């Protein structure tokens, strides 16, 4: 698959076939992802690739704590809730997803079930947890580096026919993840990525989120014309 085809074709997948992904394929994808650039080649990332019963325990723990009203316990969280144009885009993609799934605005049960899917990692057969070394906590560069490797990972997965969705729901109850994935205290849990073979019959998987135009995002300085 050509690079342009990967970038233009990739989408976030929220429905998966219950079909295992081999360790060999996952190692190949991670090897490609880790060619991502990092500040001064620090390579701050670690990956916890989880499947089977350990992943099921995380799903159960996440769901139980959320339903019990436990507060968000993410270890990496900066900034304020989205507002303005950023909030508009967040709401826009939510509307696309709800429309695809046939979930009405007043369908409280349907909306709750959709939210809980996220805490179950969208029932994907694999979850990848990205962490970084705690000694780098507060670094300006480390979040950027982890974002770069996550982007490389999801593109590498797509090029092999695998779907992904980068998400925060899977790590919102970080104590559960840390316990069942065996993550040491000297690492900070940053992000989760659900991964597996896409279920092409799952309506939300057909959603293509909108993007700003180059004209809206880029300023060209010193060019003629």
What are these regions (language model features)?
Residues 1-225:
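Acidic, surface-exposed loops and disordered segments
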């Amino acid at each position: 698959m050509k690079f342009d085809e990967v970038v233009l074709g990739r989408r976030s997948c929220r429905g998966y076939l219950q079909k295992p992904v081999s360790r060999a394929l996952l190692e190949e994808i991670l090897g490609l992802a880790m060619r991502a650039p990092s500040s001064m080649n620090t390579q701050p990332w670690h990956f916890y690739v989880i499947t089977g019963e350990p992943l099921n325990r995380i799903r159960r723990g996440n769901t139980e704590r959320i339903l019990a009203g436990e507060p968000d316990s993410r270890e990496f969280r900066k900034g304020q809730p989205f507002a303005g144009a950023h909030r508009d885009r967040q709401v826009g993609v939510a509307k696309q997803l709800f429309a695809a799934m046939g979930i009405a605005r007043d369908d409280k049960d349907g909306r709750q079930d959709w939210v809980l899917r996220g805490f179950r990692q969208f029932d994907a057969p694999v979850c990848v947890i990205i962490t970084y070394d705690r000694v780098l906590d507060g670094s300006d560069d480390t979040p950027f580096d982890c974002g770069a490797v996550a982007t490389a990972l999801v593109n590498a997965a797509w090029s092999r026919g695998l779907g992904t969705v980068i998400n925060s729901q899977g790590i919102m109850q970080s104590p559960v993840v840390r316990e069942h994935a065996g993550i040491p205290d000297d690492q900070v849990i940053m992000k989760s990525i659900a991964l597996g073979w896409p279920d092409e019959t799952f309506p939300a998987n057909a959603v293509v989120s909108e993007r700003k135009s180059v004209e809206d995002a880029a300023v060209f300085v010193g060019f003629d014309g």
